[in-house]
């Protein structure tokens, strides 16, 4: 039986395998190292903090499994939020229902799926992000997600002045933010 916390296992894996390949999209030569994945997770954690996400908030993800799908998943669970994975084969009406019924506040989706969804039917969603590059596809009125993302590299520099390093990987709920 594993005596460690599930999240701590990931934390240790990121540190111990920093320069090794972690995720690769099928059929593509580019890979993310564990260190690059950890840095992407840190960026999403900064975004979550900026948007005042709390432990237990729900984040939906729908799209073909790829590296960014995994990064969104990992960022969500290591932040303490709840992931709501949705099968990409569901029709738009079912997706609207699942997202609303789950009370998700963020949605990560493929661009092709987003083209078939109606933002006005996603009543509780504060922002929608592309699984292609994490750009903001939609934000609710009054949200500042797009503005924040334009300056994410500066926020990373401000938060991690020595650069994001192995030592900065700390996945105890809501604690990766300094």
Which residue stretches match the model-derived regions?
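AMP-dependent adenylate-forming
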Residues: 9-33, 138
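Conserved AMP-binding/adenylate-forming core of the ANL superfamily
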Residues: 22-66, 70, 74, 91-96, ...
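Short acidic/polar active-site loop segments enriched in Thr and Asp
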Residues: 54, 105, 126
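Conserved AMP-binding
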Residues: 63-66, 87, 96, 170, ...
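Structured binding elements
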Residues: 80
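Short beta->alpha connector loops at strand-helix junctions that form conserved
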Residues: 86-88, 132
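Conserved ATP-dependent adenylate/AMP-binding module captured primarily in the ANL superfamily
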Residues: 88-120, 165
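ANL superfamily adenylate-forming
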Residues: 115-173
């Amino acid at each position: 039986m594993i005596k460690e916390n599930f999240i701590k296992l990931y934390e240790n894996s990121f540190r111990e395998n920093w320069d090794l390949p972690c995720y690769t999209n099928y059929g593509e030569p580019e890979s993310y190292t564990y260190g690059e994945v950890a840095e992407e997770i840190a960026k999403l954690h900064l975004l979550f903090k900026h948007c005042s996400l709390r432990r237990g908030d729900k984040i939906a993800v729908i799209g073909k499994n790829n590296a960014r799908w995994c990064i969104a998943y990992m960022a969500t669970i290591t932040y303490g939020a709840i992931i709501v994975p949705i099968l990409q084969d569901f029709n738009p009406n079912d997706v609207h229902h699942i997202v609303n019924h789950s009370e998700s506040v963020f949605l990560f989706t493929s661009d092709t799926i987003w083209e078939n969804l109606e933002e006005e039917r996603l009543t509780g969603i504060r922002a929608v992000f592309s699984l292609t590059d994490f750009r903001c596809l939609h934000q609710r009125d009054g949200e500042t997600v797009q503005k924040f993302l334009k300056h994410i590299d500066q926020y990373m520099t401000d938060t991690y002045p020595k650069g994001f390093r192995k030592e900065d990987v700390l996945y105890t709920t809501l604690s990766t933010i300094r």
